[in-house]
Amino acid sequence: MAASKGNAAAAACALVLVLLAVGAEAQGGGGGECVPQLNRLLACRAYAVPGAGDPSAECCSALSSISQGCACSAISIMNSLPSRCHLSQINCSA
């Protein structure tokens, strides 16, 4: 059961990354350059679940290759998801 939940979480994370890439492209303003950068983050999907070990070298390389503009755009899109889905903002502070 735990492995199933882990696989589901990894799949959900991968889906979010792909959606962010598509969203960045749809927003225009050079978003097309972000798509390949964000797609490379799929190498990080195993790390993006609670309890994961250290990220792989491939993940770290992918993360280091993302431009600041693409990273900020992806974070902005991710932060807007709850309100766009008519949900409360997620507060992760303790």
From Swiss-Prot:
Record's protein name: Non-specific lipid-transfer protein C4
Q: Which gene encodes it?
A: C4
Q: Which organism is it from?
A: Oryza sativa subsp. japonica
Q: Highest taxon of the source? A: Eukaryota
Where is this chain glycosylated? 91
Keyword terms:
Disulfide bond, Glycoprotein, Lipid-binding, Signal
Its biological function? Answer: Lipid-transfer protein that may be regulated by the transcription factor UDT1 in developing anthers and play a role in tapetum development.
Q: What cystine pairs are annotated?
A: 34-72, 44-59, 60-85, 70-92
A GO molecular function term, named singly, is: lipid binding
| Stored PANTHER family | NON-SPECIFIC LIPID-TRANSFER PROTEIN C4 (PTHR35501:SF7), PROTEIN YY1 (PTHR35501)
Does the keyword Oxidoreductase belong to this entry? no
Task: Give me the segments passing through the membrane.
Answer: none
